[in-house]
């Protein structure tokens, strides 16, 4: 006689076990709620007692997500006494923690679909896209408060740049420009100063952006570092008249390369770098003149003109401590931030409007600012302080 083979459906068994555990958790939690209510009223349900502190008035149901699944709590209603159960308090703390976790996952670049999968794995139930959307609205309020926070202290070095994103408006795609500023404070630490939507990178947009930063408390600006955008130099002079402007040398090189034949790119690169390898501003100017002459001899008239017209704006950094030169003559710090922004925005694709684009950019900036990026000293400012003391001493001698 052949033996009967019993086949087991593993998924069904797992489901039955999960439901058994979930039911046990639900029953245990509700028993704890009843016990808490008895303790508060100092009497069991329907019990007559002189020590009774309150009376029961039915229940209300409340859902709770646990690692075993969704359970329903039958919370006792009490009259004559406030029922603040420890279980509900833990639920509130957990609810807040879950919200914070979901927001952080979103800000860290995790897609909505991935957030749903993660919540199901962690808590036994999926968080719906509408819930994530509501949490993002909550995050937006926090991000706006951060974006508009008052700026305290002084920021000698300010780096600015524009980030272009796409928005879909009525079926047509157009650029959205987000202007970003990062400052180095007097203690040498970096801080994201702000971001604002600009219709385009022109004088009006930059002027509005700088005035907004100044209105929030930005002061002590001595050098503004950025690419040569339309109207930026004029806007810097009007809003921060005491500040100097440093054109990013990397962007300057790229601009020269646009009119340089591929076969001569390497030679031109070495020539440009030789200008900024000089130890003094005067030596750099002399080297630049020699480079312009050499480019003309190479029949690169357009490249020669770009160098001749733009070189002076790239030499401003020589007026500051030599220890800072490598970090204040380029916009590389902001370029790295922009890569982080684009990494997140690529997941989203296009935006319905400029406000949503600004929110996501600020969310990413805020996230990065809370990492090692914002807590690690970017540069020592002792050399700048020393330069100021020496200049102040020289001024005093001149007055004497």
Report the location of each language-model feature.
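RNase H-like nuclease fold core
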Residues: 74-79, 87-92, 125-126, 131-225, ...
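Short, amphipathic alpha-helical "recognition" segments used to contact nucleic acids or chromatin
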Residues: 97-109
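Acidic/histidine-rich catalytic cores and adjacent linkers
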Residues: 1-4, 35, 43, 107, ...
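DNA-recognition alpha helix
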Residues: 113-124
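Metal-dependent DNA phosphodiester-chemistry modules and their immediately adjacent helices/loops
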Residues: 84, 256-290
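Conserved beta-strand -> loop -> alpha-helix junction used to position metal-binding or nucleic-acid-contacting
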Residues: 223-230, 235-271
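Short, conserved DNA-binding cores of transcription-related domains
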Residues: 1-81, 85-89, 166
């Amino acid at each position: 006689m052949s033996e009967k083979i019993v086949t087991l459906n593993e998924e069904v068994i797992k489901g039955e076990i999960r439901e058994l555990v979930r039911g046990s958790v639900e029953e245990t939690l509700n028993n704890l709620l009843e016990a808490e209510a008895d303790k508060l009223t100092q009497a069991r349900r329907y019990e007559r007692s002189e020590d009774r502190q309150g009376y029961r008035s039915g229940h209300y149901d409340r859902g709770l997500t646990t690692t075993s699944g969704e359970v329903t709590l039958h919370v006792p209603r009490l009259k004559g006494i406030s029922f603040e159960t420890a279980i509900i308090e833990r639920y509130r703390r957990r609810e807040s923690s879950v919200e914070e976790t979901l927001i952080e996952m979103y800000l860290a670049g995790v897609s909505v679909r991935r957030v749903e999968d993660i919540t199901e794995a962690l808590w036994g139930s999926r968080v719906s896209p509408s819930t994530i959307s509501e949490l993002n609205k909550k995050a937006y309020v926090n991000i706006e408060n951060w974006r508009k926070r008052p700026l305290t202290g002084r920021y000698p070095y300010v780096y600015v740049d524009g980030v272009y994103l796409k928005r879909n408006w009525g079926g047509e795609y157009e650029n959205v420009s987000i202007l970003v500023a990062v400052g180095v404070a007097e203690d040498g630490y970096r801080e994201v100063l702000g971001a604002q939507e600009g219709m385009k990178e022109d004088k009006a947009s930059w002027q509005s952006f700088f005035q907004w930063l100044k209105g929030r408390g930005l002061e002590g600006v001595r050098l503004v570092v950025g690419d040569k955008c339309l109207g930026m130099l004029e806007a810097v002079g009007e809003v921060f008249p005491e500040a100097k402007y440093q054109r990013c040398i990397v962007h300057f090189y790229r601009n020269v390369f646009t009119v340089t034949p591929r076969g001569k790119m390497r030679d031109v690169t070495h020539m440009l770098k030789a200008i900024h390898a000089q130890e003094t501003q005067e030596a750099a100017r002399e080297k630049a003149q020699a480079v312009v002459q050499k480019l003309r001899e190479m029949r690169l008239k357009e490249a020669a003109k770009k160098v001749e017209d733009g070189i002076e704006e790239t030499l401003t950094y020589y007026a500051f401590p030599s220890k800072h030169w490598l970090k204040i003559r380029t916009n590389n710090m902001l370029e790295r931030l922009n890569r982080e922004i684009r990494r997140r925005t690529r997941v989203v694709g296009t935006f319905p409007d400029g406000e949503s684009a600004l929110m996501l950019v600020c969310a990413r900036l805020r996230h990065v600012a809370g990492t090692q990026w914002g807590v690690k000293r970017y540069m020592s400012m002792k050399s700048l302080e020393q330069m100021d003391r020496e200049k102040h001493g020289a001024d005093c001698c001149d007055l004497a």
